[in-house]
């Protein structure tokens, strides 16, 4: 008799415990070890959303935003300046001392890669802008010319290259087939009106009709 009463009390306590758990939810019912009920368990707070710049994503094609070969400013390019020594001549007369000037040659490249920079590589693009090395500034120098036959020396003023620069050229500069080098192109035609050619109109119409 006492055993049956004890079993009834245990059943009532278990039933009351399940009622309390249903009222409070499954958040309070968890294992004391490491397990948490996945449906309504306690989850850690979500991490703050990272900025797009700090995430591991390829931007600008995997290159830094300011890539050397994508710049359009000619001041960021430089070219080699070769020193050239020569004598100034005027007929049979020649200068007593040679003069030194710069020869602008070579391909233009980023200033940070010239002349001896670490990390050289292919920085140009086939379809990119074309930069040419051209003279930038000139200087005037007076030289003394010595003539043979005991003639009196003469003085002459020459113009020498002082510095070079890179100039951006377009594709039109290299398309020589578009330029007319004939004698008619050298003479500007002023005061003349161009008249349409009447010859060959019938033949051209016949060719167009037979083309289809």
Curated annotation (Swiss-Prot):
Single GO MF descriptor: BMP binding
Composition bias, Basic residues: 190-202
Gene Ontology biological-process annotations: negative regulation of BMP signaling pathway; negative regulation of Wnt signaling pathway; ossification; Wnt signaling pathway
Pfam families noted in UniProt: Sclerostin
Principal cellular location given in the protein's record: secreted
Glycosylation sites recorded in the entry for this protein: 52, 174
GO CC aspect terms: extracellular space
Disulfide feature: 79-133, 93-147, 104-164, 108-166
Membership in a protein family: Belongs to the sclerostin family.
UniProt-recorded name of the protein: Sclerostin
UniProt source species: Bos taurus
């Amino acid at each position: 008799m006492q055993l049956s009463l004890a079993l009834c009390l245990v059943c009532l306590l278990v039933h009351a415990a399940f009622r309390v758990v249903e009222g409070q939810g499954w958040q309070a019912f968890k294992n004391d070890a490491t397990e948490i009920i996945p449906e309504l368990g306690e989850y850690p707070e979500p991490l703050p959303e990272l900025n797009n710049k700090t995430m591991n994503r390829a931007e600008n094609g995997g290159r830094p935003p300011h890539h050397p070969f994508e710049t359009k400013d000619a001041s960021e390019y430089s070219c080699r300046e070769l020193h050239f020594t020569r004598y100034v001549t005027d007929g049979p007369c020649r200068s007593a001392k040679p003069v030194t000037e710069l020869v602008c040659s070579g391909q233009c490249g980023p200033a940070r890669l010239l002349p001896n920079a670490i990390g050289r590589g292919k920085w140009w693009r086939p379809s990119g802008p074309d930069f040419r090395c051209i003279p930038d500034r000139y200087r005037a120098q007076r030289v003394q010319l010595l003539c043979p036959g005991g003639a009196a020396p003469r003085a002459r003023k020459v113009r020498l290259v002082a510095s070079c620069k890179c100039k951006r050229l377009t594709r039109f500069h290299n398309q020589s087939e578009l330029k007319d080098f004939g004698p008619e192109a050298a003479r500007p035609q002023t005061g003349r009106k161009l008249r349409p050619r009447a010859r060959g109109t019938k033949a051209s119409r016949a060719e167009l009709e037979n083309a289809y």
